[in-house]
Amino acid sequence: MLVTMPEARALGMTGRVEALLGQRLAGTIDRVSPNPDVRELAPMYSDFWRRYGQCEVVVALGGGSALDTAKLLMVAGEDDRFATLVDALDAGGDFRPSRTKRLITVPTTAGTGSEVTPWATLWDRHVKHKKYSLHLPETWPEAAIVDPQLTRSLPHAVTLQSGLDALSHALEAIWNVNANPISDTFAVTAARDMMRVLPQLMVSLDDEALRAQAALAALQAGMAFSNTKTALAHSISYDMTIRHGLPHGIACSFTLPAVMRLAIGRRADRDAVLAQVFDGDIGRAPDKLTAFLNGLGVATEFSAYGVSEPESSAMIAAALDGPRGRNFIGATA
């Protein structure tokens, strides 16, 4: 099965995969929309298991939403009902699939790192106004095909948002209670490279070498946070996306300087790793990061997004108490 987004057909990507697989391809689902929602996925899930229950492999082609959708589709309980999966996520309990598929990921953006992680994000914008994260041993990709050529058609806004998502993944893996030497290695390299490459890429969108460097940085950031999970900046971002409509890449990155200020001084070992990203200058790191974001046209104040000071304070307090917020090294301080 091929799971992808509608625009992949116009870009020639869907046809290319269909030609390569020929009769081995059971079918194509190309109705993936940004930020998969419970209401949209429920009928797609039922149709998938009814029509393609016997297929063995899912190929996910697209950005984070396509990869997330594939992971959500590929696991089923005894009753093949999407509601069973959603109820388990909502209750915070275990979902133990009785049937699964193998997954091959082919990212067309350089940001989510989903090609090398087991996580899939699911949104409920209509009933419970929540964000869920699926994370199962079965949803780890079996293989990832990272071809920077597939990212060259990305427009300016998506390139920016994807790159900032990757940067957030890298930094969130550093100020994280689950950090380890392996995640640190990936995170530092990813953060440094993305901060170097992204400003250049924004003025040279068709540069193949820059696209390749961004794709590698995003993959390395994915490897970093696949070890640690994300932390406070992502926890804050969920409300910003659900309630204020902010694209995820902006929502999870505009608070990075503020979160960094909260992180610095909490743990000497984390300060030392952060310093590696900013040429040893930990004291000026938040200001450098603010200047970097502002230079890309990203404001770093809640007020720029229509959020009042009381609302932002409440949002931060709630985020610190959330599952991702509790990964932050300053959450219990």
At which residue positions do the language-model features occur?
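ATP/NTP phosphate-donor binding region
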Residues: M1-V57, F302-S303
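Glycine/threonine-rich beta-strand-loop-alpha-helix active-site module
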Residues: R39-S46, R50-P148
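Glycine-rich phosphate/pyrophosphate-binding beta-alpha loops
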Residues: G111, L219-C252, G322-R326
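Carboxylate- and glycine-rich phosphate/diphosphate-binding segment that chelates Mg2+/Mn2+
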Residues: W119-T228, F328-G330
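C-terminal charged capping/lid subdomain of soluble metabolic enzymes
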Residues: E138, L274-A333
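Short alpha-helical scaffolding segments that buttress acidic/His motifs in well-ordered protein cores
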Residues: L167-L171, A214-G222, L256, L289, ...
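Active-site pocket-lining segment
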Residues: D239, R243-E301
